[in-house]
């Protein structure tokens, strides 16, 4: 008791004196081990000119100090851009399938799925702020006492706002908003058209009412059905039932932000029971957060720490690449990965067909890979088998071994093949390029001269290099984030996915804050550098599979409207 009292008095005196400190928990041995590690790191921090105060903030943010040093080195030296060799196209890195072949692959998956544990992984942590960006800008800049909405649209050349207002009654949230407006403004019916539209937008985004820009996309009304309005959570539950269930069980994993988890759970409580009842399939739902330890420090143009008004360090999330750690924690034979906003109101059967077909491609290739690795382990591979495996690597996995391979001894050839095959596998749907912003499939050369298939974002390309720009512009396909992943090896053990990340494929993100340049580091993207060393198969899939809602006006597209 006296010890606890002494500790709390001592702690308070440190707080009063504004002295940085770290509180350790655990038994004596673990506290001692932690203390030694902290002291070692603190002395390292001091060598690099980092104050005790800053060190404590970094420690409390759970970021290993070596990671901070790595980030500072990256800010100083920059990051090499991707070296594009050519776009991946059908018959040159992208597998093209006929409708019959899609059906055949899907049927193969249906045949095999009962012996597999399936899971759907949906990144869903972001707020919907970007979705309503043009509406927020309108509310910030528009003064209804000084100009008309039409004058604002002309002044700003804001076609998005014009479309939003013209098609307002087509949005699935229109009726609920209209009802609320009539409660708030008793004279709403007789108001001028501009006032009606202005109040509609204001109420939609107001924190006192609908507050849509601060909510996660997952809980927003997306689709108007005859009987009800569905949000993306419900649509993902429906998709689970259609293609991600085996033995009457489906598993769904959302990555969410901590502040939004209650919103998810409240929705899931109602929707899960409804979908389970209609389908007869049990759906297990789990959540995880993006680890704080994957955040980045923020620096200025001199690579010095940037601080807020309270003199605290500023940390930023490390981007969706951080989710490789969440994916690494999952246990399943086949994992479907899809973004929260890529759902459809109609044609769910068609979507299911293509998802199942991708899974069929994965299982077929995986069977062959596992068979070869099993034979290698049992030493059943002979010299005359190598040609067949080399052809498989080339034709099915787009891996060329190069001329040096022929000079290897038999033992080294087998070791090389084992190293190439013993990796997680991803099958990625690719849609026809229609000018959407985002990444695409390319043949890329790394710093060791090795060429492989990668999904590359525009921000990874040197846009000042004419040749690279031409290759980027020649892309025929686009990455819709439509992945099916195999994360277990031939012994049915989970891979450590962190071992297959290309740490050199991150991004430096530059932003202007109060007129000053600030930089932060974004981890290699989940489907970019985080999976750079996976076995990769790209499959062309129809555009019907890609229906993202990036802005609120996307809800006006046919895929999100009643038919």
Give, region by region, the residue ranges found by the protein language model.
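Residues that form or immediately flank small-molecule/cofactor binding pockets and catalytic motifs
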Residues: 26-28, 290-292, 488, 544
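Hydrophobic residues at beta-strand termini and immediately following loops
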Residues: 24, 288, 539
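Primarily single-stranded nucleic-acid-binding OB-fold modules
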Residues: 398-426, 435-442, 450-456, 460-563
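NTP-dependent small-molecule kinase module
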Residues: 2-47
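Low-complexity, highly charged intrinsically disordered N-terminal segments
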Residues: 45-95, 220-223, 227, 250-253
